[in-house]
Each structure stands twice: as structure tokens, then as C-alpha cells.
């Protein structure tokens, strides 16, 4: 997994500040074109832009757009949103699937052979206002999922006005983590606008349901050898009844105490919750506190999984009841739900349960899928296809799939937007 040094954010600000220095704030897209990007030994052959999408709501969302290296005029337009909520989508650009990636020296960029803009025009949007370089006129950054969906929709409409040459291109909405909320809520608005050629949505390691994520995490932890038989027996005794377990909002005090032990093991024992089998950047501290190990010392992602930890900000069943409803609107679109299978922040089992809860007809039974690796064809993971939704795992990957498994991720992405069998 790519390692980014602790001065990543400082360098990122340097890149953006330097890049924006070359821009005019008066015109777009020509005024937003990046003519020189520090850190690259050779400037790209494709066009790329950075600027603001100014919304009538008083929000100004920063974007970075990279044209396709293939056929920009006909290749799809892909919108990418990182999660959090509160993580910059420049994480996706500069550490996951963008055309240039931050290198270990923290001072240079190098081209990514598995960049998603090899075959698509990709729009990275910093959302909501307050994230990254995005801001609000009234300085009020309190928001909710409904408002964020509206502003993301308005941002996409504004982008298509500034770049009318892409107005008829196929559009795919994609995201990661809390993108499991952002993307379906945005898609519901976009699908009501016939002027946007929406073709599909994809979510990686998404937060689709707090309840299912919490319940599945305990099973994940036990079957990956984290809990031990004594703790597991206690959980079965106090949190389960007739084979059904409630690790989400169980009011049994003995169950709650044991779930606290699970929380400590998963989040505070020195494990990397974003990739169970990856080391912690900077190493595990001698004295462990309630600070989560991160796969990147400066890439801070929000913890979703523990009701014990976050019960004061969660509303029971809200995710499952409302956002399952959002997915039901997408029946005529191609939908991909994919998960790195060693992520503990948004584990694969919870998302698989979520997809199955939609009760769609199974079209293709669970099977392996393959990609071309350095040593020939390799197993990328497993895939199960329903009426219009595919659930796909990426073997050995954590939360940020394109970072951990770039070749497999590119193959998956290519098949998704090209409507090829996985």
C-alpha cells in the first residue's frame, strides 16, 4: 500500500495553492485550466482543471477535473466523492485512482498506470462546503444528507454548464465510504433530471446501513481471529437470542460491556481498521490510547462502525430504512457495490447483507472474478449479480481499494462503465 508522509496535507495545500495561482477566477473552463502542476517531471498530455462551482445556495464547491486520456468527447463523465463525511475527494485524486499520485518523498508526483481517467473523464468534487477548499458565504457549515445531495446536484449542473461539451456524455456517480449515503441520495435527484445522461452508480466500501455494519463487524472480527472463544461465547450468551444477534442497539448491560471490549480490540489495540493486514503508519505506540490506527498518518477518516462509540450521533435504523428506499429508485441503472474484504471501517459482510436486503432477483450466483496481474490471471475477488446490482469483493484490499489493489480496481471500474461482465 502506498505510504504518504506526515506532511501530506501541507504538500497538498502547496499543490493547490500553486496550481490556483495559475488560474483566473473570471472564466471557466479556460480560466480554470491548470497549465503547470508542481511535482511532475513532465506535464500531462491531457487537459485538467481546478476551480470553483458557484451555487445559488451560497456554496462554492472546489473541483478538480481530469479529461480522459482516451476519447474525452465520447468517454463517460464520472463524478467521484470521498466520504467521511468530511474527507476531501482530492484523497481519491492524489492517493487512489487519479492520473498522478503523491510519492513517498512527499515532494513529487508520479503518473498512475491504473488511473481511472485512462478511460473516463473524472470530476473530483470537494463536498460538502467546508471540506478542503470548498466554502460557504455565510460560514455556516452545519448540513445534512438532503442538503448535501441538493448541493452536489447543483454542482454537477453547474459543471455541465461550464463544460457543455460533456452535457450529453454518459454520467456515472461514484464514491467511497460515506459515499454509500452521498451517491444514492444524489442519484435520486439526478435521475429526475432528463438533461443528465445518468447511466449508473458505484460505491466502494460504503456506509449503507449502520445497523448492518455494526452487526456484521462483530462476526468479521471473530472469524478473523480477533476476539477469542471466551469473548465470543459471552457475546452469544448476552447479545443473541435463538440464533439472532443484535450488536447494534442491544440494551442488555452485559452485552454492552462485551461490545466495549470488541470496540477496544478493533479500534484501540493497534490494528489498522482500514486494512486489517496492513501495518499502522508510524508504528503502534508503546502506550495505546483510544486513538485509532490509520493506514496513513495524515489521512483521517471518520469511524462509522461502533454504536458504542458513536451512539450519540446515530439514529436507529435511519440508514437502513431511508437509504434502502433510495436504492430502490435505481432499478433501471447499472449499480455496483464493491468492497475490499479486509476493511473493518465498512466491512464487506454488512454491505453484502444490505444488497441482499433489497430482495432483487439473483441473475448470477456468487463466483470468482479474474483480472490480469503481473503473473497472469489472478482472482480479484467474488461477485454476485442481481437484477441491476452487482456486489463485488476485492481480495486482500482494505477501505481504499484503488490504493491497495490498483490493477484489480481498474479492471473492475473498466467493466462497470463499459457494461462488460465482471
Name the predicted role of every residue range.
Residues 1-422:
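Terminal and linker regions of secretory-pathway proteins
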Amino acid at each position: 500500500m502506498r505510504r504518504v508522509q506526515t506532511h501530506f496535507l501541507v504538500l497538498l495545500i502547496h499543490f493547490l495553492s500553486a496550481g490556483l495561482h495559475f488560474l483566473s477566477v473570471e472564466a471557466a473552463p479556460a480560466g480554470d485550466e491548470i497549465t503547470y502542476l508542481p511535482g511532475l517531471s513532465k506535464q500531462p498530455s491531457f487537459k485538467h482543471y481546478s476551480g470553483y462551482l458557484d451555487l445559488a445556495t451560497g456554496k462554492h464547491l472546489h473541483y478538480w477535473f481530469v479529461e480522459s486520456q482516451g476519447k474525452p468527447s465520447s468517454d463517460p463523465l464520472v463524478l467521484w466523492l470521498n466520504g467521511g463525511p468530511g474527507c476531501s475527494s482530492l484523497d481519491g485524486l492524489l492517493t487512489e485512482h487519479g492520473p498522478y499520485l503523491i510519492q513517498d518523498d512527499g515532494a513529487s508526483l508520479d503518473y498512475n498506470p491504473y488511473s481511472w481517467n485512462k478511460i473516463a473523464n473524472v470530476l473530483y468534487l470537494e463536498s460538502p462546503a467546508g471540506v478542503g477548499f470548498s466554502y460557504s458565504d455565510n460560514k455556516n457549515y452545519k448540513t445534512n444528507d438532503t442538503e448535501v445531495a441538493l448541493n452536489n446536484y447543483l454542482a454537477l449542473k453547474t459543471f455541465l454548464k461550464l463544460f457543455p461539451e460533456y452535457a450529453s456524455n454518459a454520467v456515472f456517480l461514484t464514491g467511497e465510504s460515506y459515499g454509500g449515503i452521498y451517491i444514492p441520495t444524489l442519484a435520486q435527484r439526478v435521475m429526475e433530471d432528463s438533461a443528465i445522461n445518468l447511466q449508473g452508480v458505484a460505491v466502494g466500501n460504503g456506509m449503507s446501513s449502520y445497523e448492518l455494519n455494526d452487526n456484521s463487524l462483530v462476526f468479521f472480527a471473530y472469524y478473523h481471529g480477533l476476539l477469542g472463544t471466551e469473548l465470543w461465547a459471552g457475546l452469544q450468551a448476552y447479545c443473541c437470542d435463538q440464533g439472532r444477534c443484535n450488536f447494534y442497539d442491544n440494551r442488555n448491560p452485559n452485552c454492552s460491556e462485551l461490545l466495549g471490549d470488541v470496540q477496544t480490540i478493533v479500534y484501540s489495540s493497534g490494528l489498522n481498521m482500514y486494512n486489517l493486514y496492513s501495518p499502522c503508519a508510524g508504528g503502534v505506540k508503546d502506550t495505546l490510547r483510544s486513538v485509532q490506527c490509520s493506514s496513513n498518518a495524515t489521512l483521517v477518516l471518520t469511524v462509522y462502525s461502533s454504536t458504542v462509540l458513536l451512539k450519540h450521533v446515530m439514529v436507529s435504523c435511519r440508514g437502513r430504512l431511508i437509504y434502502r428506499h433510495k436504492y430502490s429508485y435505481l432499478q433501471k441503472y447499472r449499480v455496483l457495490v464493491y468492497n475490499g474484504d479486509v476493511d473493518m471501517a465498512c466491512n464487506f459482510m454488512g454491505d453484502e447483507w444490505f444488497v441482499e436486503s433489497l430482495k432483487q432477483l439473483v441473475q448470477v450466483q456468487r463466483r470468482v472474478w479474474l483480472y490480469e496481474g503481473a503473473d497472469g490471471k489472478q482472482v480479484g475477488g467474488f461477485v454476485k449479480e442481481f437484477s441491476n446490482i452487482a456486489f463485488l469483493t476485492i481480495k486482500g484490499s482494505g477501505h481504499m481499494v484503488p490504493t491497495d489493489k490498483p490493477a484489480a480496481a481498474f479492471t473492475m471500474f473498466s467493466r462497470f462503465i463499459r457494461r462488460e461482465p465482471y
